[in-house]
Amino acid sequence: MNILVVKTPEELAEAGYKLIKEVVKSKENPTLGMATGSSPLGIYAEMRKNKLDTSHATTVNLDEYVNLPHEDKNSYHYFMQEQLFDHLPFKQTYVPNGMASDLEEECKRYEGILVANPVDLQILGIGENGHIGFNEPGTPFNSPTNIVELTESTRQANLRFFENEEDVPTHAITMGIGSIMKAKQILLVAMGSKKAEAIKELLQGEYSEACPATVLQRHPNVTVIADPEALSLCSEAIADEHRQVFTISDLLSDSRVGETAN
């Protein structure tokens, strides 16, 4: 697992963008797994600013709220249109349909899309409790795309995007952990002390469904981009090894900088 330590959101955005650009430019028909929320915003801004040619790329999104119309400003359909799809051309884009009349069938349909479009690079954030996508603690590591009931902590974390607490959706469709693990490469981004406990579990915690992110310990190609605050609860050995700023060029040149032993 490669750890890239950055000092600012701008450095995180630039590093994440360069990793995405490398995948997009090196693949004939790349598939990008897209995340939403605040974590990837800077990366998407870099993609827009640099007018990255994504005309040959397909995107698949991690998740979507249930019963939130696509035109609602808090839906992930709307988010992706605002952040990327209205600005850059893509070969094809896919977001789960949380308005589907048969949600179980929608999960099967979306899992089929993932099988037909193997993900080259999956972008992830990480929840304070270690969730990835909307896969909460206790989710089986082999889970496919599924419907989840959002925990109170996740709903509270997302409350800032809504006017009232009752407006925050209670359910979502999410790629399962098993689906996420099929990606050829994973980029996880985290900033701030609120993510410190989750990052500690990811890097040195027990491999356990109690912390969904620990599944990444078994993935062969993961890059974590984090700031010192997000790494602040890691052991001294981890801190000594990673508390310096490496460049994304090191990662792109197959350097073993910041590689953790699992």
Curated annotation (Swiss-Prot):
Catalytic residue list: 63, 129, 131, 136
GO cellular component, one term: cytoplasm
Pathway membership, UniProt: Amino-sugar metabolism; N-acetylneuraminate degradation; D-fructose 6-phosphate from N-acetylneuraminate: step 5/5
EC number(s) given by UniProt: 3.5.99.6
PROSITE patterns cross-referenced by the UniProt entry: GLC_GALNAC_ISOMERASE
Gene3D superfamilies in the cross-refs: 3.40.50.1360
Enzyme class per UniProt: hydrolase
Keyword entries, A-Z: Carbohydrate metabolism, Hydrolase
UniProt cross-references to CDD domains, sorted A to Z: GlcN6P_deaminase
GO biological process: carbohydrate metabolic process; glucosamine catabolic process; N-acetylglucosamine catabolic process; N-acetylneuraminate catabolic process
The keyword Hydrolase belongs to this UniProt entry's keyword annotation: yes
InterPro entries, A to Z: Glc/Gal-6P_isomerase, Glucosamine6P_isomerase, Glucosamine6P_isomerase_CS, NagB/RpiA_transferase-like
Pfam families hit by this protein: Glucosamine_iso
KW Hydrolase (keyword) present: yes
Catalytic reaction(s) noted: alpha-D-glucosamine 6-phosphate + H2O = beta-D-fructose 6-phosphate + NH4(+)
GO MF annotations in UniProt: glucosamine-6-phosphate deaminase activity; identical protein binding
Cited function: Catalyzes the reversible isomerization-deamination of glucosamine 6-phosphate (GlcN6P) to form fructose 6-phosphate (Fru6P) and ammonium ion.
Protein family per UniProt: Belongs to the glucosamine/galactosamine-6-phosphate isomerase family. NagB subfamily.
Name of protein: Glucosamine-6-phosphate deaminase
